[in-house]
């Protein structure tokens, strides 16, 4: 039975059950998800703990009677006397199978997360490249505008320079010859 069921049977909160297990270092099994799983023996121990606390015994003075489990060793196998070897083997096989299934699900979930992170990373890299390209385009466009502006300035300066030359040439042509030059024409 899980922690919630044990707490209901004892008439305490789930946190209280968890605290007792941790502080008194009670041997409680855990399922494949890491949650406590209590047997009838565990519930009996927890009931004793509750009774001692109810009678005013401080937590550090609570004594726990742990049932002694005996084992026979036969051909390098350990067999618990309370449970036949076949049932124990079946339970172990079942737990192992559930554990392997859980591990497979965890592995698949991790692979999906990795694939999603890789996809996001590629997308972010594409966005960065796109941004850089847009920035370079803007810079190129600004440079083109500057070049165009400079070309216009150069054209204006060249046309002004031509006009000034033309004006200077016309002035030279229109200037009356000085009297001295007219007297001495060679």
Curated annotation (Swiss-Prot):
Chief place where the protein resides: cytoplasm
Annotated DNA-binding residue span(s): 3-23
Coiled coil: 90-170
SUPFAM superfamilies: Putative DNA-binding domain (SSF46955)
GO cellular component terms given for this protein: cytoplasm
Keyword Transport appears in the UniProt entry: no
UniProt keyword Zinc present: no
Biased composition range(s): Basic and acidic residues: 160-175
Localisation per UniProt entry: Cytoplasm
CDD domains found in the cross-reference section: HTH_MerR-trunc
Signal peptide: none
UniProt GO molecular function: double-stranded DNA binding
Positions of the UniProt region annotated as Disordered: 158-186
Keyword line: Cell cycle, Cell division, Chromosome partition, Coiled coil, Cytoplasm, DNA-binding, Sporulation
One GO BP: regulation of DNA-templated transcription
InterPro entries xrefs: Chrosome_anchoring_RacA, DNA-bd_dom_put_sf, MerR-type_HTH_dom
HAMAP family assigned to the protein according to its UniProt record, in alphabetical order: RacA
Function: Required for the formation of axial filaments and for anchoring the origin regions at the cell poles in sporulating cells, thus ensuring proper chromosome segregation in the prespore. Binds in a dispersed manner throughout the chromosome but preferentially to sites clustered in the origin portion of the chromosome, causing condensation of the chromosome and its remodeling into an elongated, anchored structure.
Family in the record: Belongs to the RacA family.
Protein's name according to its UniProt entry: Chromosome-anchoring protein RacA
Taxonomic source organism: Bacillus licheniformis (strain ATCC 14580 / DSM 13 / JCM 2505 / CCUG 7422 / NBRC 12200 / NCIMB 9375 / NCTC 10341 / NRRL NRS-1264 / Gibson 46)
């Amino acid at each position: 039975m899980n922690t919630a069921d044990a707490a209901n049977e004892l008439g305490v909160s789930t946190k209280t059950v968890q605290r007792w297990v941790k502080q008194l270092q009670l041997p409680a099994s855990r399922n494949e998800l890491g949650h406590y799983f209590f047997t009838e023996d565990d519930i009996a121990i927890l009931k004793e703990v509750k009774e001692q606390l109810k009678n005013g015994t401080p937590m550090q003075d609570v004594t726990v009677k742990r049932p002694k489990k005996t084992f026979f060793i036969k051909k390098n196998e350990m067999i618990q006397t309370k449970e036949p070897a076949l049932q124990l083997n079946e339970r172990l096989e079942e737990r192992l199978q559930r554990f392997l299934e859980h591990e497979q699900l965890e592995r698949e979930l991790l692979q999906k997360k990795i694939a999603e992170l890789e996809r996001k990373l590629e997308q972010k890299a594409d966005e960065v490249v796109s941004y850089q390209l847009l920035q370079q385009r803007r810079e190129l466009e600004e440079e083109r505008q500057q070049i165009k502006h400079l070309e216009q300035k150069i054209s204006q300066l060249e046309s002004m320079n031509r006009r000034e030359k033309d004006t200077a040439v016309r002035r030279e042509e229109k200037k009356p010859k000085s009297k001295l030059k007219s007297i001495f024409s060679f």
